[in-house]
């Protein structure tokens, strides 16, 4: 991740990232992999607002540089405006991340898919674009030692439950 220094002008910092991205895209092409950028929430994260990284990303074909679009972070940052960010970048989504959260005071707390702030319409909107790339279901809310058989059983149940929710969101299209 790149981070902004909030004591310095944002636009100049954005322009300073441009050549770094250019070098990264060139290196990835040379070794045969596709770079992706995950949007991440936070007051100083480059890409948190989506438009900033997209102002650079749009200079490249999606096959050369794309988003790992994270709906949790887009919702956290954009609230109800996440559809604007989605529509801005939808042709450059290389991977779609699904996870959910709720607010506890000012703190973001991850929760099972469908139990928080993330709008199920994201799945529908994604599928209506004709998207056929990777979908990543995150279960960051799980805790415990995965070596413990009891905990592992709970992990499996959580994955199955969240996968059922995800399938229902994707079928809405």
Predicted features and spans:
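Active-site acidic/histidine proton-transfer and metal-coordination neighborhood
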Residues: 1-67, 76, 156
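Histidine-acidic metal/acid-base catalytic patches
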Residues: 50-69, 75-173
């Amino acid at each position: 991740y790149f981070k902004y220094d909030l004591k310095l002008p944002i636009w100049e910092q954005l322009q300073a990232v441009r050549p770094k991205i250019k070098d990264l895209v060139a290196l990835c092409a040379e070794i045969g992999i596709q770079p992706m950028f995950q949007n991440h929430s936070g007051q100083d994260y480059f890409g948190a607002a989506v438009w900033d990284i997209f102002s650079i990303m749009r200079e490249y074909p999606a096959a050369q540089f794309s988003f790992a679009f994270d709906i949790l972070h887009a919702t956290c940052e954009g609230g109800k405006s996440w559809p604007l960010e989605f529509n801005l970048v939808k042709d450059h989504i290389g991977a779609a991340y699904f996870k959910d959260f709720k607010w506890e005071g000012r703190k973001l707390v991850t929760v099972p898919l469908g139990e928080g702030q993330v709008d199920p319409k994201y799945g529908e909107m994604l599928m209506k674009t004709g998207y056929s790339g990777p979908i990543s279901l995150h279960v960051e809310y799980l805790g415990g030692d995965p070596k413990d058989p009891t905990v592992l059983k709970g992990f499996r149940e959580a994955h199955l439950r969240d996968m059922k929710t995800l399938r229902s969101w994707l079928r809405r299209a």
